[in-house]
Amino acid sequence: MESKQNRALKEFDSLYKMIDDVYHEIALSMHLTDSAFLILYCLLELGDGCSQKDICKLYSISKQTVNSSVKSLEDKGVLIRKAGVGRDIHLFFTEFGREFSEKHIGPVFDMEN
């Protein structure tokens, strides 16, 4: 017989998958990868100047994934990178990136809060 704890974990996993699918569809509708969406979302949440390391920790995304997405977003003129102390890289919106994020990602952020 399945324990209450196992049933609860299965239910949690199912809900997590459903939520993840919703965010995936939102990102696709904006022609963004999931990681690019999370980076822009994080910049809106934490503000200009957050580090790539902050994003990795906050969303449990690998450094390589964040770095690849940041490079792609930078190539598209959405954000810029600036060196920080040591090896830290800080991210800042371009004017286009801020407008895009506030228009498209801002409503998602507002809906959650």
Locate the predicted segments by residue.
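Membrane-interacting alpha-helical segments
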Residues: 2-6, 58, 62-63, 91-93
